[in-house]
Amino acid sequence: MPVSALAFEPLVDVQARNMGEAQADVAIRGGIFETTGFRAGAVALYDPQTGHYSAEIPAAPAMLSAPTVLTGADNALGGWNANAGTIAYEWRRVRTGGMASAGAGDNRLWRAEAYQGWVSPVGAGGRRLAADVAGAWSDSDGSRTFGESRFRRYNARLQLAGDGGQTDLFYGWQSKFISWPNLYTPYNVIESDDLRTELLVLNHREELGGGDFVAAGAYWRRNVDHYVYNRTGATPGPSNHTTWVRGAGAEGRLTTGTFAWNFSANFIADKLESDTLTWGRFNTRNHTRASLAPETSWALAGARKLTVLAGAVFDDTNRDASAVSPVARLALANAAPGALADELYVSYAASSQVATYTALNSRPSAGLFRGDPDLGREKARNTELGLKGARGNWAWTAAVFHRSERGLVDWIYSTSLPNARVASAVDIDTTGIELVARYTGRRLDLVLGYTGLRKDADYGNASADASFYALNFPEHRLTAAVTVRAGRGWEIRLDNEARRQKPNALRVTGDDAVLSAVEVSYTPPRWSALRLTAAVDNLWDSDFQDVPAVPAARRQWVAGATLAW
């Protein structure tokens, strides 16, 4: 899945239940799963029931670009309903060729994947018609009892592409069954989730030169969810939910004279049908968002350039009050030899978002999940100071940031109400530092990262003995990804993470963890189309709970082969 590549990304914290492909919450800069957004081309992907399903993107990674993590001013302008950050993908250019992969491992794990792309000769206007298809399948009994997962995904895409632009028409269908102890609650029962996700996207992007571009798209998404709280008991009964989303978006950058105009616009209409989320004030909602931010630059002495960007974002729904959020960025580029960095910048960005239906429409006075139909718009203010640089084989970024959030919707646990999770608004301030260094060489690649976070939270009158999400964060997190090309067809990948987590009353294991994954691959020198792999996840068999009270997946191994043509 696309989320697979994020597991050890230094800018992203993937909080997995079982494997990340089974269920994963994605957090950015100490945010929570519902303050992280996803984009594919010009459209913002969204699940209105719960942010737990936002990462359910039924698209083969081979069809998507490597993700870009948008934060600060970039997120305010290019994100949607995501106060912490956005994972942004573009549609990859189709090439003639394909691959097939298969593997097997312990816990009766098997997996398979296939991809094929075709590109026609150059046609009228220098454009090519292309198409690709993909399928993926996996089954596992899981590393814990009642921890099985079943996965199927099918994709098809048509593409018209040339030197200046690309149009993609994509359809994806995905089914997933997951089961795990304490999947979403801390009550020591076996829970399961059965999902069916469909996505239809039309996207066009036109490059205009000099960094200017325009992009527009539209999509339709349906997610069907069958959740069972206790697979081995009779009550409470299963919950059934279906959500629909229709959306359209456009973004671009156009230069006129000395000004460049950055703009975006989105419209999203959602709908929920549910047999349990029926206690709110509405089950349909229309969202409108527009942003405009002109920027201009001045050349300075010493090969330096100053760029100023300033603008605003307008957010509105037909159910909530609207909001206008200012955005500003000041950047100093320095091309002089020996400069400390290629760019120094400071930014300020306000943003806002609204809660999902699980928080709004769960019954307020009874049940496992307690909602609040009066939860209002969540607002954030982001301030950031950072630098970027590259020298030789090295590239690095550093940032110090502060995010002040008001009315963030968190799920809390209270000893006075031990049999429920309660959606509660919290005012929370997050201060952090983020350092990333990347080295690319002939034999060795390195990606090193460090994130340090501190939070101050005020839940008002709510009784919060523990937080499932807002206060589940690493105070210190180190990542190290190492790729060694040892020669004669051998390659070794080591992904490592060390973290010191904020203490949490719901976590029954330690707050410190070292997590590693290793993959060894071999490509026969005389048959470069074949790649043999052996991999181990959770190498040290750590019991660290990514999400408090949710048992960790145990050590797992898999071996397989990939044939490309």
Residue positions per predicted region:
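Surface-exposed extracellular loop regions of Gram-negative outer-membrane beta-barrel proteins
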Residues: 115-140, 174, 218-228, 260-269, ...
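C-terminal beta-signal and adjacent terminal beta-strands/loops
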Residues: 501, 520-565
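Short acidic/polar hinge/loop motifs at secondary-structure boundaries
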Residues: 43-71, 85, 89-91
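Gram-negative outer-membrane beta-barrel transporters
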Residues: 297-308, 395, 401-404, 423-505
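Extracytoplasmic beta-strand/coil segments of soluble accessory domains associated
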Residues: 4-47
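Flexible loop and strand-edge segments within Gram-negative outer membrane beta-barrel domains
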Residues: 140-151, 165-247, 277-278, 282-283
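Short strand-turn segments of transmembrane beta-barrel domains in outer membranes
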Residues: 68-74, 85-120, 135, 139-148, ...
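Outer-membrane beta-barrel signature, preferentially recognizing the C-terminal barrel domain
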Residues: 184-210, 241-243, 343-406, 414-440, ...
